[in-house]
Amino acid sequence: ISLGLVGSEMCIRDRYMGLMGHPIADAYQTMLTDRVEVLRGPASVLYGSNAMGGVINIVTRKMQEDGVKTHAQIGYGSYNTLQTEVSNRIRKGSFSSVVTGSYNRTDGHRDNMEFEQYGGYAKLGYDFNDSWKLWGDVNITQFKASNPGEAGNPYIDNDSRITRGMTSLALENHYEKSSGALSFFYNWGRHKINDGYHPGGTCRELRNIELCHIGTG
């Protein structure tokens, strides 16, 4: 996953969130992360046209040897905050797979500040040889969030219900002096957003937005 910085905006390479112009961090599964690389300055040659200001490259873990690995983590804190995540990785010969799921929630430190999120990710890969490999993945996240507004002038019913999904398929080759890839991707989303209103005010319009984005690379 690569985040390209364009001025003050930030977009995932090949995974645009066109409604708000930025990626949804809640969609990432942290247990898959091996390391995070931060590149300053233009990097469009390697990471696409959105990497004009720099790149945040999230490198996912890879199984180097045959076997099965399963990890789980859970955390609980203030304001009834719960964070859970589980992952399973398999490698057998040329085949590899990754499946993860997460659930997070909190009541928030104020009334009408609840947040709840479900997320899942799956990836299948096949290595034809040392130079060529094929892989496909899918990532889905759904969350509900409430915004209470300013403490002295709170919002009522300023709620969002958002579902975002992404799937991609890629054929890659890596040689000593060259590398290449042919990739296809599809993004979709559904957003139910209530702008809310202040006490004594008028209810605003409920927006129901569906979008998708198809591309190749």
Model-derived segments and spans:
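Residue-level signature of outer-membrane beta-barrel architecture
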Residues: 90-92, 126, 171-175
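Surface-exposed beta-strand-turn/loop segments characteristic
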Residues: 24, 97-116, 121
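Membrane-embedded beta-strand positions of outer-membrane beta-barrel proteins
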Residues: 70-74, 99-101, 124, 136-138, ...
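Short strand-turn segments of transmembrane beta-barrel domains in outer membranes
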Residues: 26, 43, 55, 60-90, ...
